[in-house]
C-alpha cells in the first residue's frame, strides 16, 4: 500500500463523504476474503489508516476516532484500501488479529438466517467480551 502524502491526498479528494463527513468501509480478511465488519470513516480516520497501515474508524456513537483493537488488542493491519465505482464506499483488506466483532466473534456477520427465519451462529467465538471490555452495568 503506497502511503505517500500525494497518494493520500489524491484518495481523500476522490472519496465522496456523506453530509456527515462519513463514508462506509467494508472490512475483508486479506487471506480468506471473508467479510469481517462494516464501519464508518471520516477524512481524519482514513488519512490515519493510510499513514499507519492500521485500521482507524469514526465512532458515530462516541463521536471520536476509534483505533480498531486499541482496547481489545484485536488490531487490523491494512494491506489495501479500495474505492468503489461511485467513490462512496471503501473496501479495506486487512490481516485481523483475533476477533473483529466487539461481541467476540471473528466476523460481525456471525449470524445466519435459516429457512424458518430464525438465526443461527455460523462463526467462531474468539474472545469473551466481558473479559476484554468489562461488564456493562
From Swiss-Prot:
Mg(2+) binds at residues 84, 86, 88. It is found in: Cytoplasm. It comes from the Bacteria. GO terms for molecular function: magnesium ion binding; phosphoribosyl-AMP cyclohydrolase activity; zinc ion binding. Binds 1 Mg(2+) ion per subunit. SUPFAM superfamilies: HisI-like (SSF141734). Zn(2+) binds at residues 85, 101, 108. The keyword Hydrolase applies. Pathway: Amino-acid biosynthesis; L-histidine biosynthesis; L-histidine from 5-phospho-alpha-D-ribose 1-diphosphate: step 3/9. Its cofactor is Mg(2+); Zn(2+). The keyword Nucleotide-binding does not apply. Its EC number is 3.5.4.19. InterPro entries: PRA-CH, PRib_AMP_CycHydrolase_dom, PRib_AMP_CycHydrolase_sf. GO terms for biological process: L-histidine biosynthetic process. Coiled coil: none annotated. Keywords: Amino-acid biosynthesis, Cytoplasm, Histidine biosynthesis, Hydrolase, Magnesium, Metal-binding, Zinc. GO terms for cellular component: cytoplasm. It catalyses: 1-(5-phospho-beta-D-ribosyl)-5'-AMP + H2O = 1-(5-phospho-beta-D-ribosyl)-5-[(5-phospho-beta-D-ribosylamino)methylideneamino]imidazole-4-carboxamide. Homodimer. Catalyzes the hydrolysis of the adenine ring of phosphoribosyl-AMP. HAMAP family: HisI. Belongs to the PRA-CH family. This is Phosphoribosyl-AMP cyclohydrolase.
Amino acid at each position: 500500500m503506497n502511503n505517500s502524502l500525494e497518494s493520500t491526498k489524491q484518495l481523500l479528494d476522490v472519496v465522496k463523504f456523506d453530509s456527515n463527513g462519513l463514508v462506509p468501509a467494508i472490512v475483508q480478511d486479506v487471506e480468506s476474503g471473508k467479510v469481517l465488519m462494516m464501519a464508518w470513516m471520516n477524512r481524519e480516520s482514513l488519512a490515519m489508516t493510510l499513514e499507519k497501515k492500521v485500521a482507524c474508524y469514526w465512532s458515530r456513537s462516541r463521536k471520536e476516532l476509534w483505533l480498531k483493537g486499541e482496547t481489545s488488542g484485536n488490531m487490523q493491519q491494512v494491506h489495501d484500501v479500495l474505492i468503489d465505482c461511485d467513490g462512496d464506499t471503501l473496501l479495506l483488506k486487512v490481516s485481523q488479529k483475533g476477533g473483529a466483532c466487539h461481541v467476540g466473534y471473528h466476523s460481525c456477520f456471525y449470524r445466519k438466517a435459516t429457512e424458518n427465519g430464525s438465526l443461527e451462529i455460523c462463526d467462531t467465538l474468539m474472545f469473551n467480551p466481558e473479559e476484554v471490555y468489562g461488564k456493562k452495568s
